[in-house]
UniProtKB/Swiss-Prot annotation:
Region (Disordered): 1-22
Binding site for Mg(2+) 2: 308, 312
Gene3D superfamilies associated with the record: Farnesyl Diphosphate Synthase, Terpene synthase, N-terminal domain
Originating organism: Gossypium arboreum (Tree cotton)
Chain sites annotated for binding Mg(2+) 3: 452, 456
Functional description taken from the UniProt entry: Responsible for the cyclization of trans,trans-farnesyl diphosphate (FPP) to (+)-delta cadinene.
Reaction catalysis annotation: (2E,6E)-farnesyl diphosphate = (1S,8aR)-delta-cadinene + diphosphate
Protein name per UniProt: (+)-delta-cadinene synthase isozyme A
Residue sites binding Mg(2+) 1 per the record: 308, 312
Binding note for cofactor: Binds 3 Mg(2+) ions per subunit.
EC code(s) of this entry: 4.2.3.13
Record text about domains: The Asp-Asp-Xaa-Xaa-Asp/Glu (DDXXD/E) motif is important for the catalytic activity, presumably through binding to Mg(2+).
Pfam families: Terpene_synth, Terpene_synth_C
Length: 555
């Protein structure tokens, strides 16, 4: 059996015929072997000592007593935006708890900047602070006061705070329209570094941005602010570079695994996007303690991409039936019923999950992999239904298409698999909760699915024979493409409100669990706003990979 499989896998293009197959034209991978070589990850003793001393200084400053708790807000905000808050989670939580308790006492005389900053920071940490605090910035007619238009810093904070809104907070819906218009008008008149802050915010809000990308950007802005704290800035720069070294080491290991699989030669119809996949998973969790989870989840997303392309871009429907059956049975013996080229991806898929089980066995956590397998099986079952529609030339209703398209986004699978490589915070109850289609996972899935649908239709990224959610909606409801985009965007915005709502205390699950769905939604906002930035690697992916994985920060 093993020798037979080896002979099959050794063939470069086993039994691949182009007759009656779907056609896809993916551009080749753009990174080559750039990340194969692992950089030196050792740091000298002097830098390590400085790093620990600076960390202690920052911790002390977070906890330092002040007369007015609002004075702490800008420093806590800087710690978060510079990307180092993961070192001080308990200290920040304690300080914000105190600020939340003092909110009513300190609210009367606060300006727009302080009110909005406090609102955003507390909401980011799940405190259910009321948006009524913004009513005092409205005039008798119910509009935001004209005097606010000259307070650019305050407008910027109100703009960012508005992205924390939940359902029913009309004042924040109004605030985002008001601040977007006013900041856009003010932008040409601003000077550095405020101009950079406003310009970037209008393109990417804090709430929906990828934390590492945003940290890299904010470091360059923060160092030019007159009010910057030198110790905090230096600590953030060293921390960024240390994390970059860790991430490069992980990516080097993954790229060697990918190169050994040789899919670019053996399965030339599939996308070569392992670096982009790692960048995606860095967005899900970047912290050092999730190193194992990152490596496992990157391999899973890489295999999911290959499987997706098999269903969507190469295999015939008759081949997909036994392929789906083999994945459902999850048994290497099922390889015998598959075409030779499918054996390659099937064996690799099973190997990835077997490796996960081996890595988790010592911790007694291998049970988690069973949940991940079930999630992958549900994904391919949804892929098969979509392939069946195409094969039968069946045009589903929008509701039929949507109900199957949510699973085919892969986001429920990724959310569940992300839990596998996390620590003690994950229990069997976590997976049972995830399997119940909780609001936050469903919301992040809708964001993924609908942003993908808009991107594919708007930028002509789908093949003519493919079903399209936008086309289904246009045909069923007799609307234009733009009207369909608008409707989909309403669902996306509503889903972001659901995500925000699920973070308000008390929560169903611990924050680290909820953060996986939040971060999955953030990846979509960054990579898919201007098209499918994964398949057709665009500016966001290239820029993010370059800034996070290639260019260190000059210290």
């Amino acid at each position: 059996m093993a020798s037979q499989a080896s002979q099959v896998l050794a063939s470069p293009h086993p039994a691949i015929s182009s007759e009656n197959r779907p056609k896809a034209d993916f551009h080749p991978g753009i990174w080559g072997d750039m990340f194969i070589i692992c950089p030196d990850t050792d740091i000298d003793a002097a830098t390590e000592l400085q790093y620990e001393e600076l960390k202690a200084q920052v911790r002390k400053m977070i906890m330092e007593p002040v007369d007015d708790s609002n004075q702490k807000l800008p420093f806590i905000d800087a710690v978060q935006r510079l990307g180092v808050s993961y070192h001080f989670e308990k200290e920040i939580e304690d300080e914000l708890e105190n600020i939340y308790r003092d909110t009513n006492n300190n609210d009367a005389d606060t300006d727009l900047y302080t009110t909005a900053l406090r609102f955003r920071l507390l909401r980011e940490h799940g405190f259910d602070i009321s948006c009524d605090a913004f009513n005092k910035f409205k005039d008798e007619a119910g509009n935001f006061k004209a005097s606010l238009t000259s307070d650019v810093q305050g407008l910027l904070e109100l703009y960012e705070a508005s992205y924390m809104r939940v359902h029913g907070e009309d004042i924040l819906d109004e605030a985002i329209s008001f601040t977007t218009a006013q900041l856009t008008l003010a932008l040409p008149t601003l000077h550095h570094p405020l101009s950079e802050q406003v310009g970037h915010a209008l393109k990417q809000s804090i709430r929906r941005g990828l934390p590492r990308v945003e940290a890299r950007n904010f470091i360059s802005i923060y160092q030019d602010l007159e009010s910057h704290n030198k110790s905090l800035l230096q600590f953030a720069k060293i921390d960024f570079n240390l994390l970059q070294l860790l991430h490069r080491k992980e990516l080097s290991e993954i790229c060697r695994w990918w190169k050994d699989l040789d899919f670019t030669r053996k399965l030339p119809f599939a996308r070569d996007r392992v670096v982009e996949g790692y960048f995606w998973i860095m967005g899900v969790y970047f912290e050092p303690q999730y190193s194992l989870g990152r490596k496992m989840l990157t391999k899973v997303i890489a295999m999911a991409s290959i499987v997706d392309d098999t269903y969507d871009s190469y295999a015939t429907y008759d081949e997909l039936i036994p392929y789906t059956n083999a994945i459902e049975r999850w048994d290497i013996k099922c390889m015998n019923q598959l075409p030779n080229y499918m054996k390659i991806s099937y064996k690799a898929l099973l190997n990835v999950y077997e490796e996960m089980e081996q890595l988790l066995a010592n911790q007694g956590r291998q049970y988690r992999v069973e949940y991940a397998k079930k999630a992958m099986i549900r994904l391919v079952q949804a892929y098969l239904l979509e392939a069946k529609w195409t094969h039968q030339n069946y045009k589903p209703t929008f509701e039929e298409f949507r109900d199957n398209a949510l699973p085919t986004s892969g986001y429920a699978m990724l959310a569940i698999t992300a839990f596998v490589g996390m620590g003690e915070v994950i229990t069997p109850e976590t997976f049972k909760w995830a399997a119940s289609d909780p609001k936050i996972i469903k919301a992040s899935t809708i964001i993924c699915r609908f942003m993908d649908d808009i991107a594919e239709h708007k930028f002509n990224h789908r093949r003519e024979d493919d079903c399209s959610a936008i086309e289904c909606y246009m045909k069923q409801y007799g609307v234009t493409a733009q009207e369909a985009y608008n409707e989909f965007n309403k669902h996306i915005e509503s889903s972001w409100k659901d995500v925000n709502e699920e973070f308000l205390k008390p929560t169903e699950m611990p924050t680290p669990v909820l953060c996986r769905s939040l971060n999955l939604a953030r990846v979509m906002d960054v990579l898919y706003r201007e098209g499918d930035g994964y398949t057709h690697v665009g500016k966001a992916a290239k820029g993010g990979i370059t800034s996070l994985l290639i260019d260190p920060i000059q210290i």
